[in-house]
């Protein structure tokens, strides 16, 4: 299965996977408006491959069922909460 990957011109770290190059017909208009102008990244063969950020089986299923897959960046880590947790652990260890 081939797949073309595009990055968003509006949302950093957001990628759109589609089964046919430059065919955005299955992608909802509202999503395309939020995504901005798609910037081509690459076309890859998904079979027998691993992807760094997403589960390849989810990508394949979404491409077959929905006609696209949207990869969004993970939420930013809350450093303040992490610091508070570490301080609480240090207090408990004393």
Swiss-Prot record:
InterPro entries: YcgL-like_sf, YcgL_dom. Residues 1-84 form the YcgL domain. This is YcgL domain-containing protein VP0875.
């Amino acid at each position: 299965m081939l797949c073309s990957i595009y990055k968003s011109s509006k949302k950093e770290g957001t990628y759109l996977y589609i089964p046919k190059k430059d065919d955005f017909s299955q992608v909802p208009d509202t999503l395309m408006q939020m995504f901005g102008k798609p910037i081509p990244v690459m076309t890859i063969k998904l079979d027998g491959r691993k992807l760094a950020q997403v589960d390849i089986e989810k990508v394949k299923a979404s491409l077959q069922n929905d006609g696209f897959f949207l990869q969004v960046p993970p939420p930013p880590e809350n450093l303040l909460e992490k610091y508070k947790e570490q301080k609480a652990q240090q207090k408990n260890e004393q």
